[in-house]
Design a protein with these regions (language model features):
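Short conserved beta-strand and strand-loop elements enriched in small hydrophobics
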Residues: 164-168
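Amphipathic alpha-helical coiled-coil/rod segments that serve as protein-protein coupling scaffolds
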Residues: 2-129, 142-146, 152-160
Length: 168
């Protein structure tokens, strides 16, 4: 898994056929939901701070044009606005990271196939540094088999099935 936590749901059984994107496991989502809500609140706060900084900058521009405030005050207001803009970008990036982490709590099948062994059960603590994977999904849609036959065996199979293609 890409996140750490306790397995809260095991949605498949060993040997079960699964489709690409099917849910296999759910890792405890509570801390990741809280982190996302915090990140969303931080984005809203950063948007408000940016709006306030923009109002202050616009006001300082007008006052500077009338020689009421110094160029230093204007530059300070502009720097505050740029800082608030950067803070908003940072908070949006943190929100995206929190959203991704929450999505990683749902472990889905990467392909169609069959579920292998399930070494971890509900309640097990899992993390990205585990030595064993949560499970493996074996894609068995294309299988190639190599074997050897004597000419007599091939001839016998060809006679039995009517053609070499059907025999193999």
């Amino acid at each position: 898994p890409q996140v750490s936590g306790f397995i809260t749901q095991l949605c498949v059984e060993e040997g079960q056929a699964v489709r690409k994107g099917q849910l296999l496991f759910v890792i405890d989502q509570v801390p990741y939901q809280a982190a996302l809500q915090t990140a969303q609140a931080n984005v809203e706060a950063a948007e408000a701070a940016l709006s306030t900084a923009k109002l202050t900058l616009d006001s300082k521009k007008e006052l500077h044009a009338q020689n009421v405030v110094s160029a230093f005050d204007l530059q300070t207001a502009e720097n505050s606005w740029l800082s608030a803009k950067a803070q908003l970008a940072q908070m949006k990036a943190l929100e995206l990271n929190a959203r991704n982490n929450l999505s990683y709590t749902e472990v889905k099948s990467p392909s169609n196939g069959v579920v292998g062994t399930l070494p971890y059960r509900v309640g097990a603590l899992v993390s990205a540094s585990l030595p064993k994977p949560l499970t493996t999904v074996s894609d068995n849609s294309d299988m190639y088999v190599y074997f050897s036959l004597t000419e007599n065996q091939l001839l016998g199979l060809t006679r039995q099935y009517g053609s070499k293609q059907k025999a193999l």
